[in-house]
């Protein structure tokens, strides 16, 4: 446990940020799983709508530095391939 006042404040801030970042990453993962569910159930319209929502959450996570921009691009690309495979 830190003794210096500024270190105590930083610890508190870090814990708050970690919790906030975890909720954003969790929402991103949930959105991705929702797309996967619609794809596995062959629901093309719902999958496309969920894909745009998931892409938005993935981009937000990348913008905040929670995932690397190339990782975000890979996530979106893989989801898009699966959704586009439904309509083909």
Curated annotation (Swiss-Prot):
Source organism, top-level taxon: Bacteria
SUPFAM superfamilies to which the protein is assigned, alphabetical: Ribosomal protein S20
GO molecular function: small ribosomal subunit rRNA binding; structural constituent of ribosome
Keywords tagged on the record: Ribonucleoprotein, Ribosomal protein, RNA-binding, rRNA-binding
Alphabetized InterPro entries for the sequence: Ribosomal_bS20, Ribosomal_bS20_sf
Entry's transmembrane regions: none
GO cellular component term, pick one: cytosol
Keyword rRNA-binding: yes
Pfam family, one: Ribosomal_S20p
NCBIfam families tied to this protein: S20 (TIGR00029)
Function: Binds directly to 16S ribosomal RNA.
Record-given protein name: Small ribosomal subunit protein bS20
